[in-house]
Amino acid sequence: MQGTFISFEGVDGVGKTTQVERLRAYVESQGRECVVTREPGGTALGVAIRKMLLHGVDTGDENDCADIAPRTEALLFAADRAQHVAEVILPALQRGAVVITDRYLDSSLAYQAGGRELTAAEIRNLSMWATNGLLPERTYLLDMDPAQSHARLQHAEDRMEAAGNDFQRRTRVAFLDLAEREPERFHVIDASQSIEDVWARIKADFDTVSTADGGIA
């Protein structure tokens, strides 16, 4: 059986984790293997990279962390993604599983090329090389005004979340631009709706994607 590859994208606080878990439960209720993962941090190597990306580099001074240059940040994301595909995503797809990832290469394009203002073509080429061109069959972009989504956060801000309102707004615009360029892959959902309404839209769309792949009928 062919596997199904699904990604969830959006700025922080839009409710990706909640919907990922809903989709996991739905897939498993149909008797199909479901692998849920995330970027960065989907592998042991990724966990180490995630710590650097989200919290900076430990300098030995508890009051100071060395920041990461934008190009270095992009390379770290690509390294995490390459290992993630080789170790987790591709083997699961080859087994016929549904793979759901909380963030994938579109986050690099939105955060580095949009938020960090690096060159989009360079970021995309790097990500496609790292993944050997592997793209999700469907990407659910949960869209919300960053000011609204930021208010939902219930934990201390990490490095990305603390980057400022302008950064978050540029990132949201970059996500929407990506969706406009690839409408056959992206499904944009207004994340300011209720959890149930968001889930209903995801479920209805996922059923069409999975049926096309020979999965849930």
Curated annotation (Swiss-Prot):
Pfam families registered for this protein in UniProt: Thymidylate_kin
Record-listed E.C. numbers: 2.7.4.9
Alphabetical keyword list: ATP-binding, Kinase, Nucleotide biosynthesis, Nucleotide-binding, Transferase
DNA repair recorded as keyword: no
InterPro entries (UniProt xref): P-loop_NTPase (IPR027417), Thymidylate_kin-like_dom (IPR039430), Thymidylate_kin_CS (IPR018095), Thymidylate_kinase (IPR018094)
Keyword ATP-binding tagged: yes
Residues binding ATP: 10-17
Swiss-Prot/TrEMBL catalytic activity: dTMP + ATP = dTDP + ADP
Family: Belongs to the thymidylate kinase family.
PANTHER family in UniProt: THYMIDYLATE KINASE, UMP-CMP KINASE 2, MITOCHONDRIAL
Listed NCBIfam families: DTMP_kinase
Function: Phosphorylation of dTMP to form dTDP in both de novo and salvage pathways of dTTP synthesis.
Name of the protein in its database record: Thymidylate kinase
Organism: Bifidobacterium adolescentis (strain ATCC 15703 / DSM 20083 / NCTC 11814 / E194a)
The encoding gene: tmk
